């Protein structure tokens, strides 16, 4: 069995974490070695960087600082978790990866795709996800779900225009590479979203065992 790198992307309140758990359980039922992780974070050091990125602060974080911290956490995560898991043949399910950087720092913050791509190449080399599930939903629905969870982090405190730009960046990337992305309607009831995941399962298992 070869390693497979699957990322789950989408804006706030899209249900990525819940559906990551669901997909992991379905794969494990088939005897697949699954590693669940997230970004920013995934290792003790990367989780400390995550805290810096998400905690509201009186000092405004420069956009380049935010971008570099994202990739610093990613470099540690790749070295300690993702690359070793793929090398042993595991399926890695990651809640957010570099597509989130293109969506949030690119779409939301307005950084150029070229600027992000330089860091992507430097930190990741040739490594890219094999499959990316994009959980899409209207911004107002996602923000309402995020607010219902309680205290908002630094990103969740951004306004609707920011998240509209994030959403459009995700949709644009998915449209450019349909062979890598699967777009799921996350505004549906959870059971319907998970039926859509089930429909992808045979193809994922075939790639695992191919």
Swiss-Prot record:
Class in the EC hierarchy, top level: transferase
Record flagged with keyword Kinase: yes
Gene3D superfamilies according to UniProt: P-loop containing nucleotide triphosphate hydrolases
Residues reported in the UniProt entry to bind ATP: 10-17
CDD domains, per the entry: TMPK
Entry's Gene Ontology molecular function annotations: ATP binding; dTMP kinase activity
EC number: 2.7.4.9
GO cellular component entries: cytosol
Record-stated family: Belongs to the thymidylate kinase family.
Function: Phosphorylation of dTMP to form dTDP in both de novo and salvage pathways of dTTP synthesis.
Protein name per UniProt: Thymidylate kinase
Native source species: Pseudomonas entomophila (strain L48)
Lineage: Bacteria, Pseudomonadati, Pseudomonadota, Gammaproteobacteria, Pseudomonadales
